[in-house]
Amino acid sequence: MAVNANQGKVAIVTGGGSGIGKAAALALLGDGWSVALAGRRAEALEQVANSPDAKGRALAVATDVTDPASVKALFEMTVKTWGRVDLLFNNAGMGLGGAALEDITVDDWKRVVDTNLNGMFYCIQQAFRVMKSQQPMGGRIINNGSISAHAPRPGSIAYTATKHAVTGLTKTAALDGRKYDIAVGQIDIGNAVTELAARMVKGVPQANGEIRTEPLMDVDIVGRSVLYMASLPLDANVLFHTVMATKMPFVGRG
């Protein structure tokens, strides 16, 4: 019988109560990982933690990624429970739902930046601190970018700006992590079926001004993609991985 190399490995998944985070967490749990589920909605996290695949290997940790102290507590709780962190799926994010550029308030702009950029940095920083200090040293970080890390949608300036910034975080953290055996990569996802993408079925603005529905893909495909990236040995890394609905507007939005 083959030995599962991932059995007993430890992951943190932010935004783990729904959508992409939930799909990734369930894929990891199904493969034998222990998973700390982080997010703001404790009830949603508990539902995932109590799923059949969890088998006592899931921990729900209410977390606000925009608060450095809350992120620090998440990592401390994970290490206290399982002794280490092998994977961070840095997934928590938000958008403004197609708000016109001139109507975005300063508070809304700051909220998106605080979640999608600052929160992601706080998680990367804590992961580095833990992964550098543990034995064996090292681990993997997978940042959730987006097709919007390549090309924008109309009315998405805050979301797109932060997702472009995530690419900068990924490239720099990948470089800085080399000497500590910390592999850093990014998954850029297009049109997975989630609450965030639900408006696609009603039609969304296109670059030419039209309103069109767009094809979607099963979010479980994203979960399996994250699991594949997470399962590589630390001497190999998927730096950038794009997974998208085949017939959606491509990364150039054409």
Stretch-by-stretch model annotation:
Residues I124, T162:
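Active-site helix of classical SDR
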Residues A62-L74, V106:
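The beta1-alpha1 cofactor-binding region of Rossmann-like NAD(H)/NADP(H)-dependent oxidoreductases
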Residues S146:
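Residue(s) in the substrate-gating loop at a strand-loop-helix junction
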Residues D31-Q47:
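Conserved glycine-rich Rossmann-like NAD(P)H-binding loop of the short-chain dehydrogenase/reductase
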Residues Q186-I187, P205-G252:
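C-terminal helical subdomain
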Residues G17-G19:
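Conserved glycine-rich cofactor-binding loop
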Residues A99-L101, D108-K110:
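Substrate-binding pocket helix/loop in short-chain dehydrogenase/reductase
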